[in-house]
Amino acid sequence: MSEHNIRNFSINFGPQHPAAHGVLRLVLELDGEVVERVDPHIGLLHRGTEKLIEHKTYLQATPYFDRLDYVSPMNQEHAFCLAIERLAGIEVPRRAQLIRTLFCEIGRLLSHLLNVTTQAMDVGALTPPLWGFEEREKLMIFYERASGARLHANYFRPGGVHQDLPPALIDDIEAFCDPFLKVVDDLDNLVMANRIFKQRNVDIGIVSVDEAMAWGFSGVMVRGSGIPWDLRKSQPYECYEEMDFDIPVGKNGDTYDRQVIRMEEMRESVKIMRQCCAKLREPSGQGPIASIDGKFAPPPRREMKRSMEALIHHFKLYTEGFHVPEGEVYAAVEAPKGEFGVYLVSDGTNKPYRCKIRAPGFAHLQAMDWMCRGHLLADVSCVLGTLDIVFGEVDR
């Protein structure tokens, strides 16, 4: 018998690949069609965010968080604001907490809609993204009506939110909920019940409970394996302990389970949005939308026209900023992608001494090599899609 040289070959996936979900470069080592090794090359979107934050006041640093997971920006701002509030002992008014909770759930819809529909597109279905983006457009308009910006909102501020919601916007958000659930049902029938989608996703990228814990997974990646871990229930913040909602969990820990969970989470988010709208209309939901301490939030414009002190507070806030007491704190929120955390160290000045960002996508991407081994080349984009990665937060 003649001897044959068997040689694995390496190919590049990305960084311009449409299924790479950003500027990801994977070096794939293949044995025929079977993946032997995956080497993710990150850093192509690195902007030095953590270092830039050290040179800005706390208020000036907030917009940097919009640019991390730019699919659902307000969830990232939330973690930073919570960290500042815990260090400085700022009391957030109830109305501001309800508005934050409402817009965090809108962010969850924005993220899950993008992920589920582009996952369908990666396996060849072109209709779901069109339906999903139609709904995302409506949600973007809610962002715009609240903050003035569709994407980089800079709406959450230490001590509350930037401005109040007009009553008409609350009515429109509530009116959005019922028709949206119909679209989710349609997507369920079109995508989740589809034979081809199931063939491409069932039993692909299986993660057991122990493996999910060992790799530092969070969010849907953990719940897909059957662990009901959700920071909104296990470590409630803002108004989440008042809300009535369930945590969907998977059985098999595969790609398909994780997408089904994202579909269910959209329904749960709509439940929370309805409750927030109802509570915002109640007498207990009225009141200020930012801390009444003039050191942390700007005074109302009518005050500035009358009071010299208010004008001085405003000037000091936007030039020097406020000083946060010395100390360190870790604040985490249940972002759509997983546990997004901010470890904030203050030296008592008006700028953070250090701000470490814990991005869920970073922990998930490191498991790409282990999850893809033994799968076919065509399954790489399915596994990558189910990790739900955005490079703003991975590269920072």
From Swiss-Prot:
Keyword NAD: yes
Main enzyme class: translocase
Entry annotated with the keyword NAD: yes
Catalytic reactions of this protein: a quinone + NADH + 5 H(+)(in) = a quinol + NAD(+) + 4 H(+)(out)
Keyword terms: Cell inner membrane, Cell membrane, Membrane, NAD, Quinone, Translocase, Transport, Ubiquinone
GO molecular function: NAD binding; NADH:ubiquinone reductase (non-electrogenic) activity; quinone binding
One Gene Ontology cellular component: plasma membrane
PANTHER family in the cross-refs: NADH DEHYDROGENASE [UBIQUINONE] IRON-SULFUR PROTEIN 2, MITOCHONDRIAL, NADH-UBIQUINONE OXIDOREDUCTASE 49 KDA SUBUNIT
Similarity field: Belongs to the complex I 49 kDa subunit family.
Assembly: NDH-1 is composed of 14 different subunits. Subunits NuoB, C, D, E, F, and G constitute the peripheral sector of the complex.
Protein name: NADH-quinone oxidoreductase subunit D
Originating organism: Methylorubrum populi (strain ATCC BAA-705 / NCIMB 13946 / BJ001) (Methylobacterium populi)
Lineage, opening ranks: Bacteria, Pseudomonadati, Pseudomonadota, Alphaproteobacteria, Hyphomicrobiales
Gene designation: nuoD
